[in-house]
């Protein structure tokens, strides 16, 4: 397994729409393993393939406190959604940024698992938020798209400033 690089906003590759996976094979399973390693190391609860520059319809998730409930969703589709609530969301592609986003309270998702077997799962709470957030990534949509243009611009400027500062510090350290 190998840790992957998580793309950071405003990288335009985060806007690419992911392509359907036609066959679940060893290459896809290897990507899944690497994505789990990356997600756990970055202390996330979900990671879409597009966030690691793999533009396929796949995401991994583990919303458990002990990181012992790994879930794989290949070609996911939300088939039911009900209720609405706002909750703070963060994202590995937006380090240190959190914002209130409105999502469906309860959902049902259909997808393929790591073995290519179709399954359906209902979710609420953090898992429902995570599934909706990661599917948005696969569609080229980011959680900041739910915010006002002013808030989006402030976040973009903040992250660009932090990136410049990190690059300057790295150059000075050499």
Swiss-Prot record:
EC code(s) of this entry: 3.5.1.88
SS bonds (residue pairs): none
GO terms for biological process, alphabetical: co-translational protein modification; translation
The keyword Hydrolase belongs to this UniProt entry's keyword annotation: yes
Entry superkingdom: Bacteria
Statement: the UniProt record of this protein carries the keyword Iron: yes
Pfam families, A to Z: Pep_deformylase (PF01327)
Signal peptide as annotated in the record: none
Catalytic activity: N-terminal N-formyl-L-methionyl-[peptide] + H2O = N-terminal L-methionyl-[peptide] + formate
UniProt xrefs under PANTHER family: PEPTIDE DEFORMYLASE (PTHR10458:SF21)
Task performed by this protein: Removes the formyl group from the N-terminal Met of newly synthesized proteins. Requires at least a dipeptide for an efficient rate of reaction. N-terminal L-methionine is a prerequisite for activity but the enzyme has broad specificity at other positions.
HAMAP family named among the record's database cross-references: Pep_deformylase (MF_00163)
UniProt protein name: Peptide deformylase
Organism whose genome encodes this protein: Idiomarina loihiensis (strain ATCC BAA-735 / DSM 15497 / L2-TR)
Phylogenetic lineage: Bacteria, Pseudomonadati, Pseudomonadota, Gammaproteobacteria, Alteromonadales
